[in-house]
C-alpha cells in the first residue's frame, strides 16, 4: 500500500531492489474530499520506482454501502473510520491477484512519527511536569479553580487537549499520567456525561463504590515499564503505551481483519522483532530532534528514497468522516443511533447524545469521531447481539434515512445540507 510518505516509500524502494518484476502498489483516494488524498504523491513515487500502480477512488456512497460488511468482518466494535478506505484498497489489491501486501504500521510508534507525541511532549515540558511535582492538595485546588489552564497556557493546549481539558485537569489532580495512548475514544469526564446515571451506579457498585476508570489499564502497563526501566522519559512512556495499547488493539487489529476480509494478508516489516528491539534502545533525542519527527529514520533513509519524500509534511491515513457527517451520513447517524436496540439497554444518556448530534449537524463542534464510535457500537450490537438479519441500513432503512434528511433540511436547523 503506497501513500507517498516516508514509510510506504521505504517499503517500495527496498522491495524494488529485491524483485525482478515491478512492485505492485495500491492507493486509495476520496472523490469529493481531495484534501485527504495522497494520490499525486503516490503516483510520483510509483513513477520513481517503475511500479505497477493501481488506484481506487471512493465516495460517501461507498462508505454507506460497505458499512454492513465492515461491521461483520470486524467482529467487535471498532471506532476507526480508516477501515472504510482500507477495505476498498484491499479489495483493489485482491482484484489484481495480489495475496500479500506490505504496510507501514509500527513506524510512527517506534520512531516518534505522530504529531500528538510532539504536542504532548510540549505540554509536558512547559507545565505538566512542574505541576505534577506539587503536593496533591495544591494540584487538586489548581484543577478545581481552573488555574491549571493558566499554568499550562491556553496556547499550549493543542486542539485535542483543548477538547479534553477538563479530563486533563482531573488527571493532574489525581496524579495520573498525562498521555494514555491514542487508543481511547472517550475520556473519563466525557464518559460521566455519556453514560446514563443507572450505568454509572452499576459500575460503581461493581467496583466497591469507586469510579471505574480506563486508567487502570494504562497504569498496569506503565508500572510494568517503570519497573524494568525506571529512567524512561516522557517520549519513551508514550511510545511504550502505544505499542501496548493502540498498535495491537486498534491498528494491527484493523489492518488484519480488514485485509483478511478481502482475502489478502498484510505484513508489517517495521515490526520485525529485531528492528523493534533495536528501535526501543534508541535514545529519544535521536527520534525527535530540533522539531524533526522520525529524525533517525530520516537520516537512515537519506540517499535511499527521494529527498522530496523526506521533506514532505506527514499527512497520515485518514477518512473525511467529519465532512461525510455533514452530508448524508448525518441522516444515517440520526436514524441508527436512536432506533438501535442498544438504546433499550439504557447504557447511555441519549439526551446527551442528542446534544452532540445537534452540535455536529450545525457545524458547531466536530464530534464526528465520537459519533462514529457510537454508530459502530450500535450497528455491531444490532447485528451480533440482537441477531437482526443483516443491518437495518442494508435492509430497508435507506428510505427512513432519506426522509430524515429531508425533514432536517426543511426544518432549517443550520449547518450543511444533509443530502
Predicted regions and their residues:
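ATP-dependent adenylation/pyrophosphate-handling site
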Residues: 1-52
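A conserved beta-strand->alpha-helix junction
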Residues: 24, 38-73, 92, 212-224
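A mobile, often basic/glycine-rich helix-loop segment
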Residues: 110-140
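Adenosyl-5′-phosphate
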Residues: 51, 82, 91, 95-100, ...
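Short, polar/flexible loop-turn hinges at active-site or ligand-entry regions and domain interfaces
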Residues: 75-79, 125-129, 285-289
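Short beta-strand segments
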Residues: 1-3, 26-29, 55-57, 102-105, ...
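Residue-level signal for inorganic ion chemistry
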Residues: 46, 104, 272
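Short acidic/histidine-rich active-site segments
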Residues: 98-114
Amino acid at each position: 500500500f503506497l501513500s507517498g510518505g516516508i514509510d510506504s516509500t521505504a517499503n517500495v524502494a527496498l522491495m524494488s531492489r529485491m524483485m525482478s518484476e515491478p512492485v505492485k502498489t495500491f492507493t486509495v483516494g476520496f472523490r469529493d474530499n481531495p484534501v485527504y488524498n495522497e494520490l499525486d504523491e503516490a503516483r510520483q513515487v510509483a513513477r520513481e520506482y517503475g511500479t505497477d500502480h493501481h488506484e481506487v477512488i471512493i465516495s460517501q456512497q461507498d462508505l454507506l454501502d460497505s458499512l454492513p460488511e465492515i461491521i461483520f468482518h470486524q467482529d467487535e466494535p471498532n471506532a476507526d473510520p480508516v477501515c472504510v478506505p482500507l477495505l476498498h484498497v484491499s479489495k483493489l489489491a485482491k482484484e489484481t491477484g495480489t495475496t500479500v501486501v506490505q504496510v507501514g504500521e509500527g513506524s510512527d510508534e517506534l520512531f516518534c512519527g505522530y504529531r500528538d507525541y510532539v504536542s504532548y511532549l510540549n505540554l509536558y515540558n512547559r507545565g505538566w511536569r512542574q505541576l505534577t511535582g506539587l503536593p496533591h492538595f495544591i494540584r487538586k485546588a489548581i484543577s478545581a479553580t481552573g488555574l491549571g489552564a493558566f499554568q499550562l497556557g491556553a496556547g499550549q493546549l493543542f486542539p485535542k487537549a483543548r477538547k479534553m481539558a477538563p479530563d486533563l485537569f482531573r488527571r493532574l489532580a489525581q496524579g495520573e499520567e498525562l498521555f494514555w495512548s491514542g487508543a481511547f475514544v472517550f475520556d473519563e469526564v466525557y464518559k460521566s456525561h455519556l453514560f446514563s446515571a443507572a450505568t454509572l451506579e452499576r459500575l460503581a457498585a461493581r467496583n466497591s463504590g469507586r469510579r471505574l476508570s480506563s486508567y487502570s489499564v494504562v497504569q498496569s502497563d506503565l508500572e510494568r515499564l517503570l519497573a524494568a526501566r525506571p529512567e524512561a522519559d516522557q517520549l519513551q512512556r508514550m511510545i511504550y503505551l502505544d505499542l501496548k495499547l493502540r498498535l495491537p488493539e486498534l491498528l494491527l487489529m484493523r489492518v488484519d481483519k480488514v485485509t483478511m476480509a478481502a482475502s489478502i494478508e498484510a505484513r508489517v516489516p517495521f515490526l520485525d522483532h529485531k528492528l523493534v528491539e533495536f528501535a526501543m534502545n534508541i535514545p529519544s533525542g535521536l527520534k525527535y530532534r530540533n522539531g524533526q519527527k522520525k529524525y533517525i529514520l530520516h537520516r537512515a533513509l537519506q540517499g535511499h528514497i527521494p529527498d522530496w519524500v523526506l521533506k514532505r509534511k506527514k499527512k497520515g491515513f485518514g477518512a473525511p468522516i467529519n465532512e461525510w457527517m455533514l452530508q448524508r451520513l448525518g441522516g444515517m447517524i440520526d436514524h441508527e443511533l436512536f432506533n438501535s436496540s442498544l438504546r433499550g439497554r439504557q447504557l447511555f444518556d441519549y439526551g446527551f447524545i442528542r446534544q452532540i448530534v445537534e452540535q455536529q449537524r450545525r457545524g458547531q463542534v466536530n464530534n464526528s469521531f465520537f459519533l462514529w464510535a457510537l454508530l459502530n457500537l450500535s450497528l455491531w450490537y444490532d447485528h451480533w447481539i440482537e441477531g437482526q438479519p443483516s443491518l437495518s441500513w442494508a435492509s430497508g432503512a435507506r428510505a427512513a434515512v432519506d426522509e430524515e434528511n429531508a425533514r432536517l433540511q426543511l426544518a432549517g436547523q443550520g449547518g450543511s445540507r444533509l443530502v
